[in-house]
């Protein structure tokens, strides 16, 4: 929030120069990037990093595809988010600076408006092992349908099933494209009661 506050203060100073030059700006567009959290608490985020660091340092069995260190990840737990973040942005006199100049603040809240409202569902198409024994769960979707600019999407999927017994399986989720790197997630996922074709992953 601090960098946005600084930017708004600087914009207000530039607005003053524009007004002195005879212009009449009416708003500042802060753009997007309103932070949100995908995890319920910070401990989940810390636990992930501890497990990742142990893997990278050789103290734990790799849980990622080809031991990928997943160096580039979105901050899946952040604070403050949404409204509290905006309060911080507008604190320290920034809101007053905007009011004094009769400036509207435009903002692109994007996915933060729908925080917790979205879901992707995919049917399990197959469960198999590669020739080297690597377990794969194939979904009736492809990686482009949920890929981000990060190395991985760090929210564990949910298996939608009424099964309460079965053999535990750990596997990688792969998509429908017939290419080597058609991974939905780059982490091994645990299914306590197994997974079967026809199940749904959310």
What are these regions (language model features)?
Residues 7-14, 44, 51-55, 90:
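A general structural detector for well-ordered alpha-helical segments in enzyme core domains, enriched
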Residues 28-35, 109-111:
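Glycine-rich beta-strand-to-loop/alpha-helix junction loops that act as flexible
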Residues 1-29, 125-127:
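Active-site-proximal beta-alpha core segment in soluble small-molecule metabolic enzymes
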């Amino acid at each position: 929030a601090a960098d946005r506050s600084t930017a708004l203060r600087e914009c207000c100073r530039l607005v003053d120069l524009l007004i002195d030059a005879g212009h009449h700006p009416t708003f500042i567009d802060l753009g997007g990037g309103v932070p949100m959290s995908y995890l319920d608490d910070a401990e989940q985020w810390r636990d992930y990093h501890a497990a990742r660091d142990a893997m990278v340092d050789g103290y734990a069995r790799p849980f990622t595809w080809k031991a990928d260190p997943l160096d580039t990840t979105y901050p899946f737990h952040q604070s403050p988010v949404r409204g509290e973040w905006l309060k911080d942005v507008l604190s320290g006199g920034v809101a007053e600076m905007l009011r004094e100049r009769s400036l509207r603040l435009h903002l692109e809240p994007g996915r933060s408006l729908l925080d917790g409202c979205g879901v992707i569902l995919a049917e399990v198409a197959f469960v198999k092992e590669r020739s080297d024994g690597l377990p794969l769960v194939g979904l009736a979707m492809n990686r482009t349908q949920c890929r981000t600019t990060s190395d991985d999407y760090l929210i564990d999927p949910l298996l939608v099933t009424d099964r309460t017994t079965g053999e535990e399986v750990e596997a990688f989720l792969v998509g429908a494209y017939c290419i080597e790197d058609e991974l939905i997630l780059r982490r091994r996922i645990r299914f306590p009661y197994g997974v079967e074709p026809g199940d749904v992953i959310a």
